[in-house]
């Protein structure tokens, strides 16, 4: 079966590999244009584009699927299209090109967490179980009928990056299985049912820690925004980046944002019990162990994160 693959970030690469390894004829790859990366802002191909080049697959770079891009998709003559985190909308004209439609791998148990950041939102909400589904792409936001489902436990210390890494591999296998079922004529798509929740894209402000929140909520937020956009707070008006924190129910009571060096542990007060910082990156410096940062302070007494 001839398949067009659409995807952009690293989490989509396992799916591209899975389709190639399963023997599908991947006729072209649709991905976002090269983007500036690093401090020097060097234009760099997306991870999917780089992998497609290694595999010798034609790459279609597009920030928007317009009439010209749709014509290129049609020229590739795919029987089906598989899409994983492409990062753009697929208009009706393009949806109609492959006879089997576009099969989307989405990293949540739809209709829960429809949108761009399902894994991050699941971690931030404290979900115990999440998963991935393959579904028939429609013009609505992640509304199409579901072909296949897998579940994945959310571990207590999971960051969204760690959870997404696991789902990217298990989901890749699910996507290949779904396309095989479609090719064999035995795939059945079932309408979504259950409570709908939305997972809008995260912004920088989603990573800001509000120390008046309970420790559990702060821990979930810090894990949910790691690695991107990252957790942060401010000290003396300067942004300070944080890695995920540990909950400390045995620690002495502190005011929200108040910092205390307790032995080798750096504690910060919250709306409930304190949390322990693991690693911290002050403005203009490299990420370091929280204890090393604390020892470098002239005095921690009176230090309060804002």
UniProtKB/Swiss-Prot annotation:
Binding positions for (6S)-5,6,7,8-tetrahydrofolate per the UniProt entry: 108-111
The protein's name: Methionyl-tRNA formyltransferase
PANTHER family: METHIONYL-TRNA FORMYLTRANSFERASE, METHIONYL-TRNA FORMYLTRANSFERASE, MITOCHONDRIAL
Family membership: Belongs to the Fmt family.
Reaction(s) this enzyme catalyzes, per UniProt: L-methionyl-tRNA(fMet) + (6R)-10-formyltetrahydrofolate = N-formyl-L-methionyl-tRNA(fMet) + (6S)-5,6,7,8-tetrahydrofolate + H(+)
GO molecular function annotation: methionyl-tRNA formyltransferase activity
Function per UniProt: Attaches a formyl group to the free amino group of methionyl-tRNA(fMet). The formyl group appears to play a dual role in the initiator identity of N-formylmethionyl-tRNA by promoting its recognition by IF2 and preventing the misappropriation of this tRNA by the elongation apparatus.
Protein encoded by which gene: fmt
InterPro entries: Fmt, Formyl_trans_C, Formyl_transf_N, Formyl_transf_N_sf, Formyl_transferase-like_C_sf, Met-tRNA-FMT_C, Met-tRNA-FMT_N
Superkingdom of the source species: Bacteria
Enzyme class label: transferase
Record keywords, A-Z: Protein biosynthesis, Transferase
Recorded GO CC terms: cytosol
EC number: 2.1.2.9
SUPFAM superfamilies (alphabetical): FMT C-terminal domain-like, Formyltransferase
């Amino acid at each position: 079966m001839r398949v067009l693959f659409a995807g952009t970030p690293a989490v989509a690469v396992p799916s591209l590999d899975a389709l190639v390894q399963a023997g599908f004829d991947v006729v072209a790859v649709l991905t976002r244009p090269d983007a500036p990366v690093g401090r020097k802002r060097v234009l760099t191909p997306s991870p999917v584009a780089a992998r497609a080049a290694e595999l010798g697959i034609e790459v279609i770079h597009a920030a928007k699927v317009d009439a010209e891009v749709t014509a290129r998709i049609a020229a590739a003559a795919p029987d089906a299209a598989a899409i994983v985190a492409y990062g753009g909308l697929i208009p009706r004209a393009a949806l109609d090109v492959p006879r089997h439609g576009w099969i989307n791998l989405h990293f949540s148990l739809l209709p829960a967490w429809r949108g761009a950041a399902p894994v991050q939102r699941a971690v931030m909400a404290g979900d115990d179980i999440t998963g991935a589904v393959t579904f028939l792409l429609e013009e609505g936001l992640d509304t199409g009928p579901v072909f296949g489902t897998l579940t994945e436990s959310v571990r207590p210390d999971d960051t969204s990056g760690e959870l997404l890494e696991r789902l990217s591999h298990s989901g890749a296998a699910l996507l290949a299985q779904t396309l095989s079922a479609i090719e064999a004529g035995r795939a059945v798509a079932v309408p979504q049912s259950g409570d709908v929740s939305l997972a809008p894209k995260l912004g920088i402000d989603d990573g800001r820690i509000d120390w008046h929140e309970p420790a559990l909520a702060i821990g979930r937020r810090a894990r949910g925004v790691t690695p991107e956009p990252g957790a942060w707070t401010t000290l003396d008006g300067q942004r300070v980046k944080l890695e995920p924190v540990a909950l400390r129910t045995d620690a002495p009571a502190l005011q929200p944002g108040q910092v205390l060096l307790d032995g080798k542990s750096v504690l910060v007060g919250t709306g409930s019990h304190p949390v322990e910082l693991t690693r911290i990156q002050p403005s203009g410096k490299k990420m370091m162990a929280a204890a090393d940062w604390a020892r470098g302070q002239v005095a921690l007494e009176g230090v309060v994160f804002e």
